[in-house]
Regions:
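Short, helix-capping/interhelical loops that line the mouth of catalytic, cofactor-
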Residues: 23-42, 93-150, 177-178, 210-215
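Short, contiguous alpha-helical
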Residues: 68, 72-118, 157, 161-165, ...
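Bacterial N-terminal signal peptides that target proteins for export
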Residues: 1-12
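Bacterial N-terminal signal peptides
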Residues: 10-21
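Hydrophobic packing residues in well-ordered alpha-helices of helical domains and bundles
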Residues: 43, 47, 148-152, 189-192
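Short, small-residue-rich loop/turn micro-motifs
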Residues: 58, 127-130, 167
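Hydrophobic alpha-helical core bundles mediating ligand binding, dimerization, or RNAP-core interactions
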Residues: 51-54, 152, 156-159
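N-terminal secretory signal peptides
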Residues: 38-86
Length: 215
């Protein structure tokens, strides 16, 4: 009986501590600040440009061109396109379901100043190589190029609609990136666009291979 009572008290103490911490973390300190018109427009331009470039890079390819691999350990156009499409919805889900659900921390804004441009400049740079995590690697999720393209366009439209209309305080919520360190919600959105730009360049590398099928 004594053991059960001690355990129950300990559980109650832990619950109270957790509840107190949660209340402290979620108590608003300032009113939410939505994106500025300039921030929306800048992001939307980035997303539109990278969308158009990606779709142009995969348009009109034959099945041989779509599946050609420059080497056994390198991705085909189809595989790169799948990685872009998977990442599109996954990263947007991270913003909505993880980053924007975390407590606002406007005091961290100084930590991410200047990172908007850094993301847009460094992420597309193919001289810095990185390995995609297992859950973002291509596995043949879409049977055809048309199905993949539709999924990408649907995801991109959802993200752009969100940027266009949201009143979320994206600049006050943060999450660490393994390379860039802490980023705010807006910067994570920019990362989606910059990521597709990086891998569109990879598609062009595949197409430039001397053994790439002529038709």
């Amino acid at each position: 009986m004594h053991v059960k009572k001690t355990t129950a008290i300990s559980a109650l103490v832990m619950f109270c501590l957790a509840l107190t911490s949660a209340i402290a973390q979620t108590a608003p300190t300032t009113a939410p600040t939505p994106l500025t018109a300039e921030e929306r427009e800048s992001a939307l331009q980035q997303f539109q440009t990278t969308r158009d470039n990606f779709l142009k890079s995969i348009a009109g390819l034959s099945q041989k061109q779509w599946t050609f691999k420059p080497a056994p350990d390198r991705w085909s156009v189809a595989e790169v396109a799948e990685h872009i499409t998977i990442s599109e919805s996954t990263l947007f889900g991270l913003v909505q379901q993880r980053i924007m659900q975390s407590p606002a921390a406007p005091e961290q804004r100084d930590q991410v100043k200047g990172k908007d441009q850094m993301i847009l400049q460094r992420m597309p740079d193919r001289s810095h190589k990185a390995q995609a995590p297992e859950f973002l690697r291509p596995t043949g999720r879409w049977a055809t190029e048309a199905e993949l393209t539709k999924s990408f366009e649907d995801s991109r439209k959802t993200t752009m609609d969100y940027i266009r209309t949201t009143n979320d305080d994206l600049r006050d919520h943060f999450f660490d990136h393994p390379v860039f360190g802490p980023l705010d919600g807006y910067q994570w959105l920019l990362l989606i666009s910059a990521h597709s730009s990086r891998h569109t360049a990879q598609i062009e590398e595949v197409k430039a291979d001397p053994n790439f099928p002529k038709e």
